[in-house]
Swiss-Prot record:
It comes from Acanthamoeba polyphaga mimivirus. Belongs to the mimivirus L223/L227/L812 family. This is Uncharacterized protein L227. The lineage of its organism: Viruses, Varidnaviria, Bamfordvirae, Nucleocytoviricota, Megaviricetes.
């Protein structure tokens, strides 16, 4: 799937250093930038789901209202994406400028929400920005340009973990 990144989100990759190999990207010691080239990266993040009515109330009140459920989103980080592995990646995770939502799984029973009868009435959204919605098969692009500062663990980007268990714990 080829996805266009908005012009406002384009990053001058010549300014980024150090670039790291895939082997160093997946180890637990090296920080830096990784450009997805030969293979896509499968990743995970925690989010929430609510029915559409409750989600609208949450947006109005700027806090979770009524019933919501924690889910795990399976992401595909496509080729040509940039991944930032900041200094605090062990506690804050990785971030990228683009991801594709492959599936969304209920945490309590690992069932894909697409297998659920109520799927059309469910909204999946970020646990930090209730207005940011994830849809299966669609691209997730940060609302702001990807933060490339390796010292900033909380800058804009699509956050993720390479391990599903870490995503659940976060």
């Amino acid at each position: 799937m080829e996805i266009d990144i908005p012009k406002s989100h384009k990053i001058d990759t010549e300014e980024l250093s150090p670039w790291i190999s895939y082997k160093k990207f997946i180890d637990d010691k090296t920080i830096g930038y990784y450009c997805v080239r030969d293979q896509v990266v499968i990743a995970y993040k925690k989010a929430y789901i609510q029915d559409k009515w409750d989600h609208e109330k949450s947006l109005i009140n700027s806090r979770l209202t009524s019933y919501y459920e924690t889910v795990i989103i399976e992401l595909e980080i496509p080729k040509k994406s940039i991944i930032v592995k900041p200094k605090d990646f062990k506690t804050s995770g990785y971030r990228t400028n683009i991801a594709i939502v492959r599936d969304i799984f209920r945490l309590k029973n690992s069932q894909s929400i697409t297998e659920s009868r109520i799927f059309p009435d469910i909204v999946c959204f970020s646990k930090y920005n209730f207005g940011y919605v994830y849809e299966i098969g669609q691209a997730a692009i940060p609302s702001e340009r990807l933060e490339t500062d390796l010292d900033n663990p909380l800058g804009p980007g699509i956050y993720f973990w390479l391990d599903e268990e870490k995503a659940i714990q976060y």
